[in-house]
Each structure stands twice: as structure tokens, then as C-alpha cells.
From Swiss-Prot:
Heterodimer of an alpha (LcdA) and a beta (LcdB) subunit. Activated by the LcdC protein. Keywords: 4Fe-4S, Flavoprotein, FMN, Iron, Iron-sulfur, Lyase, Metal-binding. Belongs to the FldB/FldC dehydratase alpha/beta subunit family. It comes from the Bacteria. This is Lactoyl-CoA dehydratase subunit beta. It is an enzyme of class 4 (lyase). GO terms for molecular function: 4 iron, 4 sulfur cluster binding; lactoyl-CoA dehydratase activity; metal ion binding. Its EC number is 4.2.1.54. InterPro entries: FldB/FldC_alpha/beta (IPR010327). The elimination of water from 2-hydroxybutyryl-CoA or lactoyl-CoA occurs in a syn mode. The lineage of its organism: Bacteria, Bacillati, Bacillota, Clostridia, Lachnospirales. Pfam families: HGD-D. Binds 1 [4Fe-4S] cluster.
Length: 374
């Protein structure tokens, strides 16, 4: 096994076994983990407290039963899966769970949490251009920090926060480099492997993830770039799961050369910048800089233009919209984006994503037909 294969295998194992990753961290440090609900949270606070931030993004292919009691049928599958798992006690080992509430279903779920872990809820301001929005979010972060300190029994110092911010900024920068390398080496980093590298960072200390990805990049770049005889796409949406869906991309030689997925590249899009103000203020300012996301209000609707630019920069053949079933914010963005794609002559395909689905024949047929048309 080559070193590239070994690193990818390690990251895939972490991505597929989050509970083991959490248990290993507990055994190593004596501290626990804090759940991080979609989409954005001040993970740096959890890291600064010495606890492991654990992403909570549902499950793949799990049958929903108990969750139907608490959520309507038109709640997205990520929230349905999370509700199902927490009804089964899957998250009870977490020391706390942090909720941001940018959509109606997240608001609902934060109030219906059935697990034993304490829930910490905060709100991102949506009128993001105002300085008042920054001050509001600082106040929200101060409340999150105070609740974390109370629940975890620790003190989160500014020095610890600054250190965590630097670690997270480095991880985001390394992952942005990984995106470019993966685009150049689709024979090495296929759709499944690319997703695993992103997903593993949800269940690892960022400094350890950074070290592995740095080594992975160096090993890959030591080999020559080979011509790609398949198609290249940019993917946008909340997430691209289950893995059976990614297998279809591999089957038809569809390389993901860039993405705008909430679970993946949106997490690394914006750094916490240096400057005046304390760490909480600068973390709040990062939200003001966020762009191209359906959960971050943008009256100018720049997401479509951003995606078109990505296709130009990467030489992609098309855009694939991975539409999360019953996700209102994503559905509201799609008509605007689609019109812009058509006006610019950019080919696109919309596929419906549902974590509960077990049959992929329809998506397989649509992707096959789309590839043949490109």
C-alpha cells in the first residue's frame, strides 16, 4: 500500500467511525466531545476548551421511524436522521450540543432535543452588512462561551481562543489547497476519497487533520499530473451523500474539481482574520465575510455567478446541483442560479439528495445521460 493509499484509508476510517474517533480522544485526553450541528458554529471555542468538536450531519441510509413523531415528513433527511439517532441515544455521550438555527427545521429540532446532552443555541444575524450585526453575534458568542464553560467546567481564555483560531485557519488553508490538488489528480482522489478527506475533519482535532492532509498533498504532488479522459463538474448543495451516490460519479468518470457543499468547502471558505478587536469579535466578523451560501442572506444573489466562475477557473464541463430534499433555503436559490446558468450557457443538472434513500437507479440514469450529452 502506498503512503497516499494509507492516508486515505486512515481518513476514510475516521469518516466512517465517528464514535471510535470520539472514544479514542476520550481515552487519550480524558476529555469529551461537543456536538456541532449544521451549518456553522464557533468550533474554535470547543477546541480552545480542550474538547473535540464532533460534526452532526445525520447518517447514511438509516430507516426513519421514531423521528416521525417529532418532525413533519417534509423536514430534510439530515434533520430526520439526527432526530432518529438522538432518540436512540446516539449522542448521549456528548458533553454538549451546539445549535445554530438558520432554518426553520433547525429551530424546531433545537427545541425538541430528546438526548441527555445539554443544548446550546445561538443565532446568526442575517442583516450581515451592519456593524450592529457583528456586535449582536459577539453577544451570542459570549453566551455560547459562558454556557460551554459552565457545562464543561473549564475556563476558555483569549490566549487559548487565539491559538485555536490559528489552528483552524491553517486547516482551512490546507483544505483549500487540497481542493486544487484533487482537481489536478482525479485519478488519485476520486469522489469518494475527496468526500472522506472533508468528512474526517469533522471528527478529528484540526491540527492532526492538517498534518495528514499536508502529507497527502505532498505525496500526490510528487507524481506527474495525468490527462483526465472523463468529465469535470462543480458540485453545489448541502451535502453529497450517501457514498453510493458518490460511487456513481466514479463509475461514469465524473471528477469533482470544486464544490460549494455546506458540509465541505463552505466550511473552509472564510478565515478568521487578524485585526483589531478580541477573538470573539473577529470570529463574528468572519460571518459577515461569508458568501455564496443559501443560509447566509445575500440580497445580490451572487451564488450563481460564483459557481459560474468556478467552472471557468477549473475548466469544468458542468455544474451539478445536489438539491437536498425539503431544504427550503436551497430550493429558493435554485431558480435564480438556473436562470444565470442558462444565460451564460453553462450546462447544469439538478439531482435530489436524500440520506434515507436506498435506491439510486434514477440518479444513475440521469447522470449517465447527462455525461453522454456533455
Amino acid at each position: 500500500m502506498s503512503r497516499v493509499e494509507a492516508i486515505l484509508s486512515q481518513l476514510k476510517d475516521v469518516a466512517a467511525n465517528p464514535k471510535k474517533a470520539m472514544d479514542d480522544y476520550k481515552a487519550e485526553t480524558g476529555k469529551g466531545a461537543v456536538g456541532i450541528m449544521p451549518i456553522y458554529s464557533p468550533e474554535e471555542m470547543v477546541h480552545a476548551a480542550g474538547y473535540l468538536p464532533m460534526g452532526i450531519w445525520g447518517a447514511q441510509g438509516k430507516t426513519i421511524s421514531k423521528a416521525r413523531t417529532y418532525l413533519p415528513a417534509f423536514a430534510c433527511s439530515v434533520m430526520q436522521q439526527v432526530m432518529e439517532l438522538q432518540c436512540e441515544g446516539a449522542y448521549d455521550d456528548l458533553s454538549a450540543v451546539i445549535f445554530s438555527v438558520p432554518c426553520d427545521t433547525l429551530k424546531c429540532l433545537s427545541q425538541k432535543w430528546k438526548g441527555t446532552s445539554p443544548v446550546i443555541v445561538f443565532t446568526h444575524p442575517q442583516n450581515r452588512g451592519l456593524e450592529a450585526a457583528n456586535q449582536f453575534l459577539v453577544t451570542e458568542y459570549e453566551l455560547v462561551k459562558a454556557q460551554l464553560e459552565s457545562v464543561l467546567g473549564v475556563k476558555i481564555s483569549n490566549a487559548a481562543l487565539e491559538n485555536s483560531i490559528a489552528i483552524y485557519n491553517e486547516n482551512r488553508a490546507v483544505m483549500r489547497e487540497f481542493v486544487k490538488v484533487a482537481a489536478d489528480y482525479p485519478q488519485v482522489i476520486d469522489a469518494v476519497s475527496r468526500h472522506a478527506v472533508f468528512k474526517a475533519r469533522q471528527f478529528m482535532l484540526k491540527e492532526k487533520h492538517t498534518a495528514l492532509v499536508k502529507e497527502l498533498i505532498a505525496e500526490i504532488k510528487a507524481t506527474p499530473v495525468q490527462p483526465w479522459d472523463g468529465k469535470k463538474v462543480v458540485v453545489t448543495g448541502i451535502l453529497l451523500e450517501p457514498n453510493e451516490l458518490l460511487d456513481i460519479f466514479n463509475e461514469f468518470k465524473i471528477a469533482i474539481v470544486d464544490d460549494d457543499l455546506a458540509q465541505e468547502s463552505r466550511q473552509i471558505r472564510v478565515d478568521v482574520l487578524d485585526g483589531e478587536g478580541g477573538p470573539l469579535y473577529r470570529m463574528a466578523k468572519a460571518w459577515q465575510q461569508m458568501y455564496g451560501c443559501s443560509l447566509a442572506t445575500d440580497t445580490k444573489k451572487g451564488r450563481g455567478r460564483m459557481l459560474i466562475n468556478k467552472t471557468i477557473q477549473t475548466g469544468a464541463d458542468a455544474i451539478v446541483v445536489a438539491m437536498m430534499k425539503f431544504c427550503d433555503p436551497e430550493e429558493w436559490d435554485y431558480p435564480v442560479m438556473y436562470r444565470e446558468f442558462e444565460e451564460k450557457g453553462v450546462k447544469s443538472l439538478m439531482i435530489e439528495v436524500d440520506q434515507e434513500v436506498s435506491s439510486f437507479e434514477q440518479i444513475k440514469t440521469r447522470l449517465q445521460s447527462f455525461v453522454e450529452m456533455l
